[in-house]
A protein has these predicted regions:
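Short glycine-rich substrate-engagement loop in P-loop NTPases that contacts/grips substrate
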Residues: 82-110
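Conserved P-loop NTPase "ATPase switch" module shared by AAA+ and STAND
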Residues: 107-128
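Interdomain motor-coupling "hinge/lid" segment immediately C-terminal to the ATP-binding subdomain
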Residues: 153-186
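Walker A/P-loop nucleotide-binding motif
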Residues: 52-71
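A short, basic N-terminal segment
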Residues: 1-52
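Catalytic P-loop NTPase motifs of RecA-like helicase/translocase cores
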Residues: 94, 121-124, 152-153
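P-loop NTPase Walker A phosphate-binding motif
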Residues: 67-82
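Sensor-1/coupling segment of RecA-like P-loop NTPase cores
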Residues: 135-157
Length: 186
């Protein structure tokens, strides 16, 4: 498959908002030319590291680069890996049972990288977040959970994801990084 464009794979019966294949590649393409946050390397290390029992939490205030980092990480994947990536936009109406069923379908279809945006919108996330690390990460999936609810992530890390998550907090942006990202001479 190397050298070919990513396939748009249809997964029937999914309950969550999943983007894969050509649509995902098109979204990721828009972020390739943007400068990366200093903490981007931590995300890359998680995605390409050997750890298979942890998830990655990417959280912080609005407009601090979380979605751009997700798209940049997806855009830097090989074409082979791109065919194994799914992006899920969590909604308030989603729950962990739905997510569990869809992640099983994705795993069985060969997906190994899953980016779940605004995961804390799900009402039962905090009480059942270990599903991501204890089941799917140990099966070999790299799962990145992102969102703006820092308290929700902190509560999940304190309970369900204790010692099972790599956290990347994007809220603090040093002036040197800010000026580099925006091309401001200081």
């Amino acid at each position: 498959m190397s050298g070919s464009s990513p396939k748009s794979i249809s997964i029937s019966g999914v309950e969550t908002d999943i983007t894969i294949g050509k649509e995902l590649a098109a979204v990721a393409q828009k972020s390739k030319a943007l400068a990366s946050r200093d903490c981007f390397e931590q995300l890359e290390m998680y995605l390409h590291g050997r750890s298979h029992d942890r998830v990655c939490l990417l959280f912080g205030l609005l407009q601090t680069g979380k979605n751009t980092m997700l798209r940049q990480a997806i855009g830097r994947m090989t074409k082979e890996d791109l065919s194994r990536i799914a992006y899920i936009k969590a909604r308030r109406t989603d729950n962990m049972a739905m997510m569990n069923r869809d992640l099983k379908k994705l795993f069985n279809a060969g997906f190994r990288y899953v980016f779940i945006d605004e995961v804390t919108l799900m009402e039962d996330f905090i009480d059942s977040a270990a599903l991501f690390s204890d089941v799917f990460a140990t099966m070999g999936m790299k799962i990145v959970l992102s969102g703006t609810d820092s308290l929700g992530f902190w509560l999940a890390m304190d309970e369900e994801l204790y010692d099972r998550a790599k956290s990347i907090h994007t809220t603090f942006i040093p002036y040197r990084e800010y000026s580099r990202l925006l091309g401001i001479d200081s």
